[in-house]
Amino acid sequence: MKLIRTEDAVGQVLCHDITQIIPGQFKGARFRKGHIVQPEDIPVLLSIGKENLYVWEKRPGILHEDEAAALLYKAAAGRNIHGTEPKEGKIELVADCDGLLKIDRAALLAVNRTPQMMIAAIHGDLPVKKGQKLAGTRIIPLVIEQEKMDAMQAAAGSEPILNVLPFHPKNFAVITTGSEVFKGRIEDKFTPILVGKLAEYGCEMTYHKTCDDDPAGITAAILEAKAAGCELIFTTGGMSVDPDDRTPLAIKNTGAEIITYGAPVLPGAMFLVSYLDGVPVCGLPGCVMYAKRTIFDLLLPRLLADDPITAEDIARLGEGGLCLGCAECHWPNCGFGHC
């Protein structure tokens, strides 16, 4: 840094905060470290006794924090994400659309293990809204060597660390199972719950059928729904270990690839996810009907963003997989589903 007269500081970058005190009104930083001095700032600086200033001296191979933040932003921001203007050395990443936030956790860790820089993000694999803040980038010092930023870019890799996958409204099917509903002994209260949850994402139910506990009938209904063009197929009921619960067998008999039957999530341990020629077929346990949030809420955004679900993905849900059933639900702004 170098010391210059305040009148000569226009366009220069401050190396430290400058405090202003107005008795009875204000005491705090009037100008922050990293601020670029403007012509209108000169009278203010002089009025608070700053005849001289320490400013950053541009040197080859040394980057200012705003320049470094821009490089971090470039490494981090992918599809459907834009950045704010640099402010105090920080750039924030913002979602351009409603969708699913995906984070390359290994790349994020690699960047944050690089000395003197950071990217702080919200949790991935959860729904985000257009305009929502996703992450922030900055370096720790005011200036940094170009070679350190080169090391960061090498650690980050060639692909963006964060992407937002847009949601795609889909036609879906609900196949209600259980002799108690099929024979009219109780009302189907499951289907309206699903219709409501899917409507939040602009989806429409285009197929619905009620079956008894005969696996062959459930299998036929699933295949019929797929032939009708349904892009998501949900079966309700029949997912436990009771002898009359045959829905998992029915799904298997369609020829679908079973990704997992069972998940380390409560509520939602008896969940089943499979793919039938690329179409998701999910067996939903009864908790989806009565619990505020379940594994269904964790995975539905991924299904609507066409993000393939693997057995490892399900296994990872064990950390953060316990819903506390709070009196006032704040999901996804809570620990449920965060791993």
For every predicted segment, state its role:
Residues 1-88:
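Short, low-complexity N-terminal leaders and the immediately following helix N-cap/first helix
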Residues 179, 189, 206-335:
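Short glycine/threonine-rich loop/turn motifs
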